[in-house]
């Protein structure tokens, strides 16, 4: 679930809104469901060690609020870590992190289990799962790059190598929302309003299928 903290704060201007929203989410997924919240930190790519209890999330205040309360639920992926709650915690927590968008990565499991992606008060181009689709399609504007670094596990530092599908410097590889918005429909890729913001939801398998189809016709569908 991707989120924009301004969506919570438009009604309750304190972190109480974070706690209320989280409790609603947990109740909504029930015992058989799983909630995954991105807690990404890109400092590993700049030579910094990753510590899941201390490395802050760089993707929003809500995610850092949850890290402070539930850091034990955070994965050890040094770049694209997630907080995981629910039935699939063990399976997702044990995913391989040597290749960010690889066949054994957490993103591959999102597709396998057909997760529902929710963009709460943020645009659909924020979905990191789109980079996984880019990887599977082998788009021309990205390439595999190896990053060496350390992660802290049980008070000990471990040296690891991570393969990350990064964008080429000579092109603006930022995902744009224009073409994605054209894929929205009332059934499988939905748009709903929440106060003054828009929210989006789509299943991973459906998103992967329609975006791959578009990329097969135009490699630059997501960025131009």
Describe each model-derived feature in a short phrase.
Residues 2-224:
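N-terminal and secondary-structure boundary signal
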């Amino acid at each position: 679930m991707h989120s924009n903290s301004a969506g919570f704060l438009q009604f309750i201007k304190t972190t109480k809104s974070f706690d209320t929203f989280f409790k609603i989410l947990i109740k909504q997924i029930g015992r058989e469901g799983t909630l995954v919240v991105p807690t990404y930190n890109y400092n590993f790519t700049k030579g910094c060690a990753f510590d899941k209890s201390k490395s802050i999330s760089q993707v929003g205040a809500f995610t850092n609020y949850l890290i402070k309360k539930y850091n034990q639920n955070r994965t050890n992926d040094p770049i694209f870590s997630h907080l995981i709650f629910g039935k699939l915690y063990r399976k997702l927590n044990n995913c391989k992190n040597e290749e960010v968008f690889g066949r054994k990565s957490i993103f591959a499991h999102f597709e396998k289990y057909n997760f529902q992606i929710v963009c709460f008060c943020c645009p659909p181009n924020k979905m990191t799962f789109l980079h996984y689709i880019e990887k599977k399609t082998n788009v021309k504007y990205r390439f595999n790059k190896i990053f060496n670094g350390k992660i802290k596990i049980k008070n000990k530092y471990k040296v690891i190598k991570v393969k990350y599908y990064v964008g080429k410097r000579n092109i603006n590889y930022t995902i744009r929302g224009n073409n994605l918005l054209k894929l929205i429909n009332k059934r499988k890729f939905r748009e709903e309003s929440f106060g003054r913001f828009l929210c989006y939801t789509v299943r991973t398998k459906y998103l992967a299928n329609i975006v791959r189809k578009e990329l097969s016709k135009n490699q630059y569908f997501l960025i131009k």
